[in-house]
Amino acid sequence: MAETVIGIDFGTSCTSAGTLIGDRVELVRDNSDPVIPTVVYVPERGDVEVGKRAVLRQQSQPNRVVRSVKRVLGMESGNELVRRYAASSGAKLESTGDKLVYKIGTSAYAPEQIAASVLNRIRELAEQRFGGQIRKCVVTLSAAAPAGYRDAIVRAARIAHLEILELVAEPIAGALAVGLHSTSAQRRLLVLDFGGGTFDASAIVQAGMKFSPVATYGDPLLGGDDLDDEFAKAIAGAVHRQYGADMHRDVLKFAELRYRCEQTKRILSSRNDAPFTMNEAFTVGGKPRSIDLKIDRPWIEERWKPLFDRAIDVVDEVLRQAGWSPADVGAVALIGGTSLVPKFQELIAAKFGRDRVSVSPDADLAVSMGAALLTARHGATPRHVPVLTSDRAAAP
C-alpha cells in the first residue's frame, strides 16, 4: 500500500488538511468538521487538547489556552509584532534571551511545541480517517512569512513526527484550489488570502500550469481574529457608554464576548442582521445584566472600516511593487475564511470589476485543498496536479 502524504494548511486561527485519493481531495475531519481551530489547551495534568475542545476552555481557563501561535512562530522576542500579540494573549508569553516561551502554570513551552501539538492532532486524525501510519506532508506558509518561520515549522513538524516534503506559498496553493491551473491561459493574477490572522496579496503571472510570483505583500496583524477583536470592543464600548460597566476587566467574560462575536460574524456573512445574546455579561450595582441585541451588518461594517482600509492598502502596495494597474489584472481570486465577509468582497469588486473577481465556495479550505493537490507530486508514482474535486460536502 502506498504511503499517504497529507497537505496541511497550518493557519493562524484554523488548520485544515487533506490528501488525494485518486483525483479527489479527501479532507481530514474532527467530528465531521474539516476546519479545526488552531487553539491549544494545556491542562495542569493530562494531555493537551486541540481544536474545538480547546476553544471551549477559553471561557473558563484563558491563561491555559494558546491561540494564534502562528503569529509568533519563528519570531524573536524583540519584534514589535510579538509585543502586540503578547498583550492580548490568554496564555502568558515571555522572553528568555531572544527566545519566546509560553508560561502556563509552572511549565514553559516554546511556540514550536504548541504548533507541534496542532500538527500532531492533524496527523492522528488523518491516520484515523485514511488508515496506516502517516509521516510525510506538504505544508503551506504565508507569502509574507518572517525569516525564521520556515525553520520553526519544520522543527514543529519533527516534534509531531512529520517530515515536510515541500513548503509551498499559500497563494499558489489557493490558486490551484480554485482551478486557475485548469486553463492554458497566460495572464496576470492577483490572489488575496484573507485568513484568520494575516492578509496576504500576491501578484502572479500564469502561463498554464506555471505560476510565477511577481510581488507579494501582507499585513501580519490583519485577519478574522482582528475583526473579532474590533467587534468585541464595539460591544464592550456600547455597554460602557450606556451602563458604565467595563467588560475588559473580567477576563473570562471578555473571552466569552469575543467568542460570541466570532459566531455572530459568521452569521452576518450570509445575513443582513443577527441576534446577539450573552447572559450575565456584566454587572451594574452588583446585579448581573445580560446583552440582548440585534446586530445589523452595516453597523459592524462601519467599525471594521479601518481594517478594510488596511486591506486595500495592502492590495495597492502589491500592485505598485508589480508595476500593475487594476486594469492589468486578468483575474482576482479571494481565498481564506475572512474573504467571505461581504463588505470585503464588495470593496474588491469595486476596484477590479465583479466579473474578474472569484470567491472560492470553500474559501476557508482553499489553501489546504491546494496543498492536498500538491501531494500528487510526492506519491509512489509522482504525477501532475489534477483539477480539484472536493469532498467538502461528503459524509465523514
What residues fall within each predicted segment?
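Oxyanion-binding/catalytic loops of NTP- or PPi-dependent enzymes
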Residues: 1-87, 92-94, 108, 117, ...
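Negatively charged
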Residues: 121
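Generic recognition of long tandem-repeat/solenoid scaffolds
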Residues: 50, 100-104
